[in-house]
Amino acid sequence: MKNVTKRSFQTIAIVGKPRHDNALETHLAVYNWLKDRHYSVLVEEKIAEQLQLPNGKRIEEIGQIADLVIVIGGDGNMLGMARSLAKYQVPLIGINRGNLGFLTDIAPQSAFEQLYSCLEKGEFIIEQRFLLEAQIEQNGKIISANNALNEVAIHPTQVARIIEFEVYIDSKFAFSQRSDGLIIATPTGSTAYSLSAGGPILTPNMNAIALVPMHPHALSSRPLVIDGDSHISLRFAQYNQPNLEISCDGQDDLPFTPEDRIIVRKSPDILHLLHLKDYNYFTVLGSKLGWSSKLF
């Protein structure tokens, strides 16, 4: 990992996919704030074009050059950038311009105060989050693959169709299932799609993976938590409908057929997520999920 100490962030990149003018204004304000403090600032090329700024860079260039990446947007933006930038080991920090903000935890109204604490005073922590790698194997060869920070969801292309499959963990048969699909979630993703399907919440530091059935056709089907270093593979009944799909973080889709085998395991890439020094996961969790406050 790149060395990160007080005032060691010299080259900082700004990325995100602004959906409205307010978010775009945040990009410009952060750019000007960083330039005023004599940082070398890179801007993702599409944003740079919209704002008519210099130093527009492709994501790959940002990963190779930047010491820190500021993601401005919602969790969806952070997910996309995590998949693209994790392999470069560059830390990411998020300014929330979306809805939930589990991953982008800097509030826009206090962004500059919090960035000052982080960048100028070195008051930050870095958390490591692992990703999953999903592969499609056809006739013994990997034909496509992608990463996911939240979850790998395996389901029919058409909605309201069941599929039947077998799940193997570390090459050992675990269970078979008839359902609308299966969610394979990281601890990061345990508060996303997995949670809405009845899955457990896993704290981010756990080395664990959750297997969560989607509308199973048996009352005995329950979520299962396994070791994070497990290798998961799925085989599908040949009479399933021909068009199946892997969805990575709900953003990237990989089509496959019942003849293919699906392999899911921990990716070698690690997301380095930067938080302010006073970051508390349980405070964020309680706030987002509406938990009760302290009694004493």
UniProtKB/Swiss-Prot annotation:
GO biological process terms on file: NAD metabolic process; NADP biosynthetic process
Pfam families: NAD_kinase, NAD_kinase_C
Primary location group: cytoplasm
InterPro entries referenced in this protein's UniProt entry, alphabetically: ATP-NAD_kinase_N (IPR017438), ATP-NAD_kinase_PpnK-typ_C (IPR017437), NAD/diacylglycerol_kinase_sf (IPR016064), NADK (IPR002504)
Localization (cell): Cytoplasm
UniProt EC number: 2.7.1.23
GO molecular function: ATP binding; metal ion binding; NAD binding; NAD+ kinase activity
Reaction(s) this enzyme catalyzes, per UniProt: NAD(+) + ATP = ADP + NADP(+) + H(+)
Residues at the active site: D75
HAMAP family: NAD_kinase
Family assignment from sequence similarity: Belongs to the NAD kinase family.
Function: Involved in the regulation of the intracellular balance of NAD and NADP, and is a key enzyme in the biosynthesis of NADP. Catalyzes specifically the phosphorylation on 2'-hydroxyl of the adenosine moiety of NAD to yield NADP.
Protein name (Swiss-Prot/TrEMBL): NAD kinase
Source organism per UniProt: Haemophilus ducreyi (strain 35000HP / ATCC 700724)
